[in-house]
């Protein structure tokens, strides 16, 4: 009984002390004095163990040596990450170095982490630091682009990243005219469609951490002009692409009473509804169809219904069909 009373008294004193620290501001939160002895070690050890526990399995890591994926990650890093971690080989600003904890230079930050751990950190961020989570939820697929760039830094093969002070048009060009793969071609899309997508990215109706960051570099009032610049020409577009006969043809023509066929909305160079798909990048089409199928993209109920039951093999078949039929 005496032991229980003693423990209760100690617990009460501890709670009273904690309440006093909080209530009277006894703890100095100044970044100049840093943490108390042992606190930094405890936080860092907890952080490393927490990341290791929750990181994706190694078999979930995609191919990270794809130049297009690396370039896409470099473009996002330039405006979303470099302000704290700096560019490879460049010194951080004095302001950043005065943070507690100070964000490590990027080469140091990635040196002791594997790709799965880097993915978890970029996607989730870290409490009690300046490291934010990915701007939108359920877009782990986009995070791999940044991880690919970080892995290239570790290997000493990172490409030069775009200058963060590029204007909106130049920054768009750094991805949409220089990178293939999962980045869509804009020159086959209409200006109205592009403007609507920019607005959807701005409001979050179409979730994308990369594009949510990118549209902040463009004044909202210039969306129309930007869309007009990158869109398909209004005249001289050439003949309508003829759908190729092959495994994807029957699938693209397949529809129901409630869900029209792919070609009903996306056929030809000037589709009646939806963006043109003929000639679009295959990897981009596959990634977007997967997002629709998995319920990440929901802003168009018809597309959500059309893709809901697609298998991974059917997504690959359709993506290959539309990409090759338009070229």
Question: Residue spans of the language-model regions?
Answer:
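Periplasmic c-type cytochrome electron-transfer domains
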Residues: 2-87, 93-96, 109-123, 132-152, ...
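C-terminal functional regions that serve as terminal interaction/effector modules
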Residues: 260-327
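Extended amphipathic alpha-helical interaction segments
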Residues: 164-180, 239-243, 253-267
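Flexible internal linker/loop segments at domain or repeat junctions
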Residues: 205-209, 217, 226-229, 234-259
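Short cysteine/histidine-rich zinc-coordinating motifs and their immediately flanking basic loops
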Residues: 93-99, 182-187, 273-279
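Cysteine-rich, disulfide-stabilized extracellular repeat modules
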Residues: 102, 127, 168-171, 182, ...
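Extended intrinsically disordered, low-complexity coil regions enriched in Ser, Thr, Gly, Ala
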Residues: 94, 100, 190-212, 241, ...
């Amino acid at each position: 009984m005496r032991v229980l009373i003693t423990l209760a008294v100690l617990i009460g004193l501890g709670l009273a002390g904690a309440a006093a620290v909080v209530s009277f501001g006894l703890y100095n939160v100044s970044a100049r004095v840093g943490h108390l002895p042992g606190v930094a070690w405890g936080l860092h050890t907890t952080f490393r163990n927490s990341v290791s526990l929750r990181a994706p399995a190694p078999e979930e890591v995609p191919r990270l040596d794809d130049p297009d994926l690396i370039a896409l990650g470099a473009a996002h890093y330039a405006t979303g990450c470099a302000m704290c971690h700096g560019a490879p080989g460049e010194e951080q600003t004095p302001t950043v170095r005065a943070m507690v904890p100070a964000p490590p230079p990027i080469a140091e930050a990635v040196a002791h982490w594997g790709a799965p751990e880097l993915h978890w950190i970029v996607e989730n961020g870290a409490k009690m630091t300046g490291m934010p989570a990915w701007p939108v939820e359920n877009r782990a697929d986009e995070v791999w682009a940044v991880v690919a760039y970080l892995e290239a830094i570790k290997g000493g093969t990172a490409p030069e990243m775009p200058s963060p002070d590029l204007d909106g048009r130049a920054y768009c060009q750094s991805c949409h005219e220089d990178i293939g793969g999962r980045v869509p071609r804009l020159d086959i899309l209409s200006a109205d469609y592009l403007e609507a997508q920019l607005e959807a990215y701005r409001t979050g109706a179409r979730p994308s951490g990369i594009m949510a960051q990118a549209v902040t570099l463009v004044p909202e009032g210039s969306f129309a002009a930007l869309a007009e610049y990158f869109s398909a020409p209004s005249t001289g577009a050439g003949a309508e692409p003829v759908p190729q006969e092959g495994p994807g043809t029957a699938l693209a023509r397949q529809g129901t009473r409630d869900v029209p066929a792919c070609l009903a909305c996306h056929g030809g160079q000037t589709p009646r509804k939806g963006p043109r798909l003929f000639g679009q990048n295959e990897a981009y089409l596959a990634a977007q169809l997967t997002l629709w199928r998995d319920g990440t993209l929901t802003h168009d109920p018809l597309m959500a219904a059309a893709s809901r039951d697609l298998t991974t093999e059917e997504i690959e078949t359709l993506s290959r069909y539309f990409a090759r039929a338009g070229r």
